[in-house]
Design a protein with these regions (language model features):
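Short, Asp-centered acidic motifs that coordinate Mg2+ and/or phosphate
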Residues: 46-47, 96, 124
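Short acidic, glycine/proline-enriched helix-loop-strand junctions
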Residues: 63-71, 135-149
Length: 165
């Protein structure tokens, strides 16, 4: 699996990021647990974010790596679990949106996702669904899709390192 590293520096947060936080971003695993476990072992993240499809994979991963917090949302293939389709978290003063992306129609446009992020003061919007890795920045908002860590010849995930600017 390809691992893409993105160090994102946020200046002007009102306080300095004292400790570099390493986030492993996974999406669209579709029951492929072992590549995720290997990515965790390689990356050694502080947090794991799973962006849906399938949410049960995130639960199984959390059981395997109990020392690392796993935050997840549901996606378009999580028919039996619609518990949390999106969530917002704040780490070191950076507000982060986690979603699968299908409700924002990310296969055709990123505008609804960008507008939701802007409206909610989000600096980092994480989404999946397209199975294609993407990194875009607009007006201080970073949009990131890690790609699919599931059944693909081009399986990928992303690592985000939060640092102060």
């Amino acid at each position: 699996m390809e691992i893409r590293l993105h160090t994102i520096s946020y200046a002007g947060l009102g306080r300095k990021v004292t400790t570099l936080k390493r986030l492993l971003i996974l999406s669209d695993s579709h029951r492929f647990l072992e590549p995720m476990v290997r990515a965790v072992e390689h990356v050694k993240p502080d947090y794991i974010f799973h962006l849906g499809a399938l949410s049960a994979d995130a639960q199984q991963l959390a059981q395997r790596v109990m020392q690392i917090p796993v935050l997840s949302v549901t996606g378009n293939c999580d028919f039996l679990d619609r518990s949390q389709e999106q969530r917002m978290v704040e780490l070191e003063g950076v507000k982060i949106l986690l979603c699968h992306g299908h409700r924002y129609h990310v296969k055709s446009t990123l505008l609804p996702l960008y507008l939701a992020a802007r409206e909610n003061g989000v600096r980092l919007a994480l989404f999946g669904h397209t199975h294609t890795a993407l990194l875009e920045e607009k007006d201080g908002i970073t949009l990131l899709n890690p790609g699919s860590c599931g059944p693909s010849m081009r399986a990928s995930c992303a690592v985000v390192e939060l640092s102060g600017g």
